[in-house]
Amino acid sequence: MVTTDGEYFVSSLMLLENFPDGDELELADEHRLVADFDMIAPDHFILAEGTGKVIEVRNGRVTQTADLKTIFTGVHRAIDGRIYAFGFNGSVYQRDGITWRALPKLRSNVLCVRASPAGIVYACGTDGLFASFDGSDWTAFDLSTNVDLQSLLVLDDGSVLLCGMSDFAGVWAAERWVQWDVPSSDYYDLALFKGRIFVGAGSEGLMVVEGSTFKVSKANVFSYSLRASARHLAIAGNNEIVRYDGKSYPCLEFNYDLEDE
């Protein structure tokens, strides 16, 4: 996992300044299984562990730990400041202030949660899961698929772009689903950067939305996780992070010899 804010680039275990040459600053115990995190500020993070803990880190120090006893797949901070942690068995937790509460369970594993500027919360996940939360309960939508929906992106007009495995992509708008004809691939993540929507297509490279389909923006990069700031798009793949500023793609590679650890 990777996120970006100005010159800060973060993997699940370390913070790097002056990318890609900066020294690594330890962010969390390397033995923790960090599923995902969201950066509130360059020195302020929310991390969701696969072990079921959600950890808040400020200036390298843990300020809050909540053990929610769920295998988490991700975490998301909404514009209104609420935090959503989500994962297996349809679990979604919401933090308002410092208090966590469990939302009603969904029918399958949750892989992505995003909130719209209007406060509507959307979730997608395994077995074709797609639903919205109105503050009290979920409304499920039938997209006529059982593929895993990996990511969603809420657009300014209120429509929702979704992508997933087995060439699945399209847009949900005005209570209607429109399937897109996209290149054959598995799709893992979506990000809005400098007015364009980018798509992580794994080993097939980085793609960009053009009309109602995807076109290759950069081949020969592994793009499983995307994070965007006003200045950069960070692309995480197999042992590498690529930074895109709209022109160039400098790359940082991690060549760890696991046998020596």
Regions found by a protein language model. Give the residues of each.
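Residue-level hotspots at or immediately adjacent to binding/recognition sites across diverse folds
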Residues: M1-E261
